[in-house]
Amino acid sequence: MRTLTIEPLTKEAFAPFGDVIETEGSDYFMINNGSTRRYHKLATVETAAPEDQAIISIFAAEALEMPLVIRMLERHPLGSQAFIPLLGHPFLVVVAPLGDAPVPGHVRAFRSNGRQGVNYHRGVWHHPVLTIEKRDEFLVVDRSGSGNNCDEYFFTEDQQLLLDPQQVSR
């Protein structure tokens, strides 16, 4: 079983999968009589149809036992999905490029520093939310509308991957 190496979450490394939502290194302009920095358009919400709506939810997540066997990934073919940590805790992200099915050899893992969120582009394969804290909360921005917006892909046993938070790239 291949063990994923967890990479630091950077805009450049994550670009094939979506957007890193963070203020560090991002452009801003002043608003509210000069008292507020607006970090504008850090990500774009994608929806497939004009009648779709962008919605905001809160996910209250519990940690899964680690190391974790990655048995499946999901994608949202009709819209993007963003996760923004509300409690400032680091969390893990597992993704694979666009395609009919995720290729195990192309799956990558990242660690958010707790001040970064992610916006998965429409159709990008990813694991459901992976907190490393006992409990965590995320502001989620995604799509509401008709049609199935969640495809799941289950790896065969020989394709499964191992996610170990100790396997960090240096």
From Swiss-Prot:
GO terms for biological process: allantoin catabolic process; purine nucleobase catabolic process. Signal peptide: none annotated. Catalyzes the catabolism of the allantoin degradation intermediate (S)-ureidoglycolate, generating urea and glyoxylate. Involved in the utilization of allantoin as nitrogen source. Homodimer. It is an enzyme of class 4 (lyase). Belongs to the ureidoglycolate lyase family. Its cofactor is Ni(2+). InterPro entries: RmlC_Cupin_sf, UAH_cupin, Ureidogly_lyase, Ureidogly_lyase_bac, Ureidoglycolate_lyase_dom_sf. HAMAP family: Ureidogly_lyase (MF_00616). Keywords: Lyase, Purine metabolism. It comes from the Bacteria. CDD domains: cupin_UAH. Its EC number is 4.3.2.3. Pathway: Nitrogen metabolism; (S)-allantoin degradation. Pfam families: Ureidogly_lyase. The gene is allA. The keyword Lyase applies. GO terms for molecular function: ureidoglycolate hydrolase activity; ureidoglycolate lyase activity. It catalyses: (S)-ureidoglycolate = urea + glyoxylate. The keyword Lyase applies. This is Ureidoglycolate lyase.
